[in-house]
Regions:
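A short acidic, Gly/Pro-enriched loop at the edge of an enzyme's catalytic core
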Residues: 113-122
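Class I SAM-dependent methyltransferase SAM/SAH-binding core
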Residues: 55-111
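A short glycine-rich, Lys/Arg-flanked "PGG" loop and its adjoining helix->strand segment in the class I
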Residues: 136-151
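Residues lining the SAM
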Residues: 124-126, 155
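A short His-aromatic
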Residues: 130-131
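Conserved class I S-adenosyl-L-methionine
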Residues: 1-52, 65, 151-163
Length: 163
């Protein structure tokens, strides 16, 4: 896709519309999360291992549940998302739960201009990469942020799930 600006704008509006709906849904189970339940499943936890003290960049963090679950595991977390409403909710959750986390609202393609750090780990999960018009460019963003020997941890659904 040569000009993704309208695509990005529409995508942002869509995700802004979904934030409060998602936060109120049983799928995200905010009550359990607020009481300390991790949103990370067995597969993700096995892939992550011990992340205590590691710097983690969570791309497409939505409203920060997984980011804050990573923080509960001892990681130093930065979450990035296109939706300004999601980032606002992530910041509110971090404050409410007294958890450390930095949240940046940005077009992920532009993240290297806004986040001046390298990370031990880049994490993204479920329904994230299907929204990008240029996966090669997205992969370049991931590579940009990884320290030498850093890892990308990615868990996602097969696209057929949504058909």
């Amino acid at each position: 896709m040569k000009d993704a600006s309208n695509y990005i704008k529409l995508n942002k509006a869509t995700w802004n519309d979904k934030v409060d709906v998602h936060m109120a849904s049983s799928f995200y189970d905010m009550e359990a999360f607020l009481q300390g339940k991790s949103t990370l499943n067995e597969i993700e936890l096995a892939l992550l291992g011990d992340i205590s003290g590691k710097k983690v960049l969570h791309l497409q963090c939505h409203f920060g549940q997984d980011s804050l679950s990573l923080a509960r595991m001892g990681a130093q977390v930065t979450g990035a998302d296109l939706s300004d409403k999601a980032i606002q909710r992530a910041q509110e959750l971090a404050e409410k739960l007294n958890l450390e986390g930095t949240f940046v609202c940005c077009d992920i393609y532009e993240a290297p201009k806004l986040i001046d750090e390298k990370f031990d780990l880049v994490f993204t999960s479920y329904g994230t990469i299907g929204w990008f018009p240029d996966l090669e460019r997205w992969a370049g963003v991931v590579a940009h942020f990884l320290k030498p020997n850093g890892q990308l941890i990615m868990a996602d659904f097969h696209p057929v799930v949504w058909m």
